[in-house]
Swiss-Prot record:
It comes from Vibrio cholerae serotype O1 (strain ATCC 39315 / El Tor Inaba N16961). One of its GO terms (molecular function) is lipoate-protein ligase activity. Pathway: Protein modification; protein lipoylation via exogenous pathway; protein N(6)-(lipoyl)lysine from lipoate: step 1/2; Protein modification; protein lipoylation via exogenous pathway; protein N(6)-(lipoyl)lysine from lipoate: step 2/2. It catalyses: L-lysyl-[lipoyl-carrier protein] + (R)-lipoate + ATP = N(6)-[(R)-lipoyl]-L-lysyl-[lipoyl-carrier protein] + AMP + diphosphate + H(+). It is found in: Cytoplasm. The lineage of its organism: Bacteria, Pseudomonadati, Pseudomonadota, Gammaproteobacteria, Vibrionales. GO terms for cellular component: cytoplasm; cytosol. This is Lipoate-protein ligase A. Residues 29-216 form the BPL/LPL catalytic domain. Keywords: ATP-binding, Cytoplasm, Ligase, Nucleotide-binding.
Length: 338
């Protein structure tokens, strides 16, 4: 008989939860099925092939201590807070079936008086006076012998904060990654005012056990106990690293231009794996030497202000006669990177 497990995370760290998900998925026997329920504190979660500089307001996230987490699956960028409940269904093949897991989630919600439906894409929706409204999005991953379906449920998320960290000015980024599809969304507390995370988890667990006709005791997952699982520590280190969350970004070009009192500049930065591989600066500045020097020095630097500010400071120190235009350029340039 297939062993059935239910895991509940008591951590709200997105890097921990995503590392748990991936470690369990990789290490579970192919004849096992797992339900994993979790939630994250303030986080922007991006798809595996997305560009965080395009999808997110990274400066605002840093200011507000909002984490960035790149998941293993595709799809778009989403904002998580404690008003979200996340689910992951894992199973070996041929049992793995995302339609079954979707039915289980909907059955759990029906126990709470919420009658959602699956639409033609990968969303769960409700219909109200404003039309069809999305309350859940999903993404999927499959290997040769197993698969998983994970998604998020909007219970009481602060929807106003979506605009704080997503949908930035595009700043002429020409990206090869996937741009998120923005959908109209709704919180489930508009249907059931007292809905909360534990209540939803219990309803989904009950629907899960009923579907498989098994009674399963949930296992509590916490950072204090989980680091002993083989491979987890390395996966957590990867999941929380800058190289994974930013460096895995598909190649892109950042084009920016501005006119200053001393002349105009047009900057092209070719970025791969979070590193500037080529910088080109055009300018009608009377003496273009400082811009030529800057272009040479930008190549090879990490694409963030922490790496770029010292480069400009060093150039100003070496070329004091150009300090005023370089200072003006620096203020504008660093703001564009953010």
């Amino acid at each position: 008989m297939t062993k059935t497990r239910i895991l509940l995370s008591d951590s709200t760290d997105p890097w921990f939860n995503l590392a748990v998900e991936d470690t369990i998925f990789r290490s579970m026997p192919a004849d096992q099925r797992v339900l994993f329920l979790w939630r994250n504190a303030d986080t922007v979660v991006i798809g595996r092939a997305q560009n965080p500089w395009r999808e997110c307001k990274t400066d605002r996230m840093e200011q507000d201590k909002v984490k960035l987490a790149r998941r293993q699956t595709g799809g778009g960028a989403v904002f998580h807070d404690l008003g979200n409940t996340n689910f992951t269904f894992m199973a070996g093949k041929p049992e793995y079936d995302k339609e079954v897991s979707t039915k289980i989630v909907l059955a759990g919600l029906q126990k709470l008086g919420i009658h959602g439906v699956a639409n033609g894409r990968n969303d769960l929706v409700l219909e109200d006076e404003q039309g069809i409204r999305k309350f859940s999005g999903s993404a999927y991953r499959e290997t040769l012998d197993r698969g998983f379906h994970h998604g998020t449920l909007l219970l009481s998320a602060d929807l106003n904060r979506l605009a704080d960290y997503l949908n930035p000015d595009l700043k002429k980024l020409q990206a090869k990654g996937i741009t998120s599809v923005k959908s109209r969304v709704i919180n489930l507390n508009t249907v059931k005012a007292d809905i909360e995370h534990q209540q939803v988890c219990e309803a989904i667990m009950q629907a899960y056990c009923e579907h498989y006709q098994q009674q399963v005791e949930p296992e509590l997952i916490s950072p204090q106990s989980f680091f002993d699982l083989p491979g987890f520590e390395q996966k957590f280190a990867q999941q929380s690293s800058w190289d994974w969350n930013f460096g895995q970004t598909p190649p892109f070009t950042h084009h920016m231009d501005e006119r200053f009192s001393w002349g105009g500049v047009e900057v092209y930065l070719e970025v791969e794996r979070g590193t500037i591989v080529q910088a080109t600066i055009f300018s009608d500045m009377l003496d273009p030497y400082p811009m030529e020097q800057l272009a040479l020095r930008l190549s090879g630097l990490t694409y963030n202000k922490t790496a770029l500010e010292p480069c400009l400071a060093q150039l100003m120190q070496e070329l004091p006669q150009y300090q005023l235009p370089l200072e003006e350029f620096q203020r504008w340039f660093i703001d564009q990177i953010d």
